[in-house]
Amino acid sequence: MKTIKYLSMLALSLVMATSCMNDFDEPTFEQPPFGNNEIGEANMTIAELKEKYASTISANGAKEVTEDCIVEGVVVANDETGNVYKQFIINDETGAIVVGVNDVGLYAMLPIGQRVRIDCKGLHVGGYGYMAQIGGLYDGSIGRMNKSVFPSHVRIIGAPDSTEQEMKPEVIDDSFFTNDNKAKLAKYVRLEGVEITEADGTALWAPEELKNSSNVVERHIKMGNTNIILRMSTYADFANEAIPTGELNINGVMTRFKDYWQLVISSTDDIEQISE
């Protein structure tokens, strides 16, 4: 009799446990698991943000954003191949900006073509050699935001989409390179029919023996009267691949450090060889 009573109580407990388990909601996966899904609509374009802090950016300073400020853009460069480090770049239809985060592997949450919103309130906006950046404060200048801060300031919108308007690079020529064109710094662009000066069929992108103190090897492109530096990291997946020869079409992010124009590519997929 005791055995029957025990088994009856056990069966009842299992039924109750199953019933309680069924009370939990099924996961929907409608919201991204990373970031802050409470961030609202964008209320400022990237161009407006850069204009608002223009004096701080041009002075290579940094200023905390104290008002409500949300920008939205599409990721056009990230750290997936190692040629970009602890930052990603977003473009909207008005401009582009660097977002610095003291973390690696950002591409896992922010692949190329991913639309994001950045809540700038509480972060800093500043300039480093003319380049506008959203990030944190570092020794009184603009630096990377702490990785623990970042998730509360970013919202992922939808799935990555390579057909986004911002993913269509702007084809540029020598007229692009003027001092008045700072609004387009960090813009995703396309250089057509250019050659890399060092390409001879055997030269590698970024061999260790040629690196500078930043673990970067500089390669060069001449477009009209403008010299463009290709910054190649020795940590890039393609660092020891041969530089393609002949005429090339190259997609990348156009940056500037003081008086030097620099092109950053995320991958060798950004390069199309049109003649050898």
Residues of each region from the PLM?
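Bacterial N-terminal signal peptides that target proteins for export
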Residues: 1-8
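C-terminal motif of bacterial Sec signal peptides marking the signal peptidase cleavage site
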Residues: 16-19
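OB-fold nucleic-acid-binding modules
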Residues: 21-85, 89-276
